[in-house]
UniProtKB/Swiss-Prot annotation:
Claim: Transmembrane helix is one of the keywords in the record: no
Keywords from the named record: Calcium, Cytoplasm, Metal-binding, Nucleus, Repeat
One GO cellular component term noted in the UniProt record for this chain: nucleus
Domain of life: Eukaryota
Gene: CALML6
InterPro entries to which the protein is assigned, alphabetical: CALM/Myosin/TropC-like, EF-hand-dom_pair, EF_Hand_1_Ca_BS, EF_hand_dom
Family from the record: Belongs to the calmodulin family. Calglandulin subfamily.
UniProt xrefs under Gene3D superfamilies: EF-hand (1.10.238.10)
Native source species: Homo sapiens
Annotated protein name in UniProt: Calmodulin-like protein 6
Amino acid sequence: MGLQQEISLQPWCHHPAESCQTTTDMTERLSAEQIKEYKGVFEMFDEEGNGEVKTGELEWLMSLLGINPTKSELASMAKDVDRDNKGFFNCDGFLALMGVYHEKAQNQESELRAAFRVFDKEGKGYIDWNTLKYVLMNAGEPLNEVEAEQMMKEADKDGDRTIDYEEFVAMMTGESFKLIQ
């Protein structure tokens, strides 16, 4: 991630200083630009200007940032930001949540790159159709042939019968897989 400068949240917080203290974890996980962006979105939902957002608004707030968690992920996030179950959370809780989110996203990215390299042993930048089909039908929770082909067709956006890294990520994260049931 490189050298990060110490970031103070004070300039972006309009509520009592004691509820907006920077933690080292936040400064390591989020850039100044990210903090500014997230603080701006947080303030849009802070209807009363008191530095608090209703926990029920978390889904809309995340959606505005392009993050669409599942219901169970959302429930877990709500517990994390509203530990006292008061029905609201402050900017520090939200920024800490976003720091954790970014850390998990980075970990997932490195895991996906490593998995892709396992299948792209020759470093061609893609996985051929037959290799991927074999893996999908024989590893983990195996798919049947129809399911494997459907999944690959959804993932192979350019129709070249290979799966490049971007297509692989979309397939593995469920962004392209819509199995017809």
